[in-house]
Amino acid sequence: MSMGPAAGEGCGLCGADGGGCCSRHRHDDDGFPFVFPPSACQGIGAPAPPVHEFQFFGNDGGGDDGESVAWLFDDYPPPSPVAAAAGMHHRQPPYDGVVAPPSLFRRNTGAGGLTFDVSLGERPDLDAGLGLGGGGGRHAEAAASATIMSYCGSTFTDAASSMPKEMVAAMADDGESLNPNTVVGAMVEREAKLMRYKEKRKKRCYEKQIRYASRKAYAEMRPRVRGRFAKEPDQEAVAPPSTYVDPSRLELGQWFR
């Protein structure tokens, strides 16, 4: 037969009167022992248990308060001596210009988090694998392999030598239009045409001119009123010639005798 808590005692969890565990928390310790430890429902006079701090994502509660919350921020904890001796370091992801909010999963150092260990050993020589050489010799070899040739008065560098020799020869044969002498001749001809156009433009006169001397003489003879040509007055009508013929002058008598 179980006996209830003594009078004046409080519940170990909620502080209700009765001591020990009240009727609401008496059977909770059976299903959730990690939430309600046995010390919470112990007998009379048991002190109230301290507040429990639950660690998520595999973080243990060891260490001071600063270490317990360091995984919530963007600062990685220093590597352990064993990992440092083995050459394993925590490497931050490269910055791509996008500021991401701090993630609770990124700063977990336990077994259940998303921690990446990257070996920062000797970097493989990719240049040697690509046949480009390494160190200062790479630039020397590239400079030695460069091909510099003259093309129509200008120079260009074919360092990669990706253009076939046949194509280069064809371009050199078809480059007569880019001959410096041809270009200079075209420029001189253009300048001559421009000078002729300017001289012809200077001689232009947009005022009224009389091109023929006969027109000029006729214009001087015509009367003017205030500088303008005036209409000439009507002349008297000339009498038409008489059609009467004197028969004596025609000597018609000798024909009709």
UniProtKB/Swiss-Prot annotation:
**What is the induction comment?**
Circadian-regulation under long day (LD) conditions. Expression increases during daytime, peaks at the end of the light period and gradually decreases during the dark period.
Does the keyword section mention Nucleus? yes
CCT domain sequence ranges: 190-232
Locations listed in the record = Nucleus
InterPro entries recorded: CCT_domain, CONSTANS-like
**Subunit details:** Interacts with HD16/EL1.
Record function comment? Probable transcription factor involved in the regulation of flowering time under long day (LD) conditions. Plays a major role as repressor of flowering. Controls flowering time by negatively regulating the expression of EHD1 and HD3A.
Protein name (record) = Transcription factor GHD7
Recorded source organism is: Oryza sativa subsp. japonica (Rice)
High-level lineage: Eukaryota, Viridiplantae, Streptophyta, Embryophyta, Tracheophyta
Gene designation per UniProt? GHD7
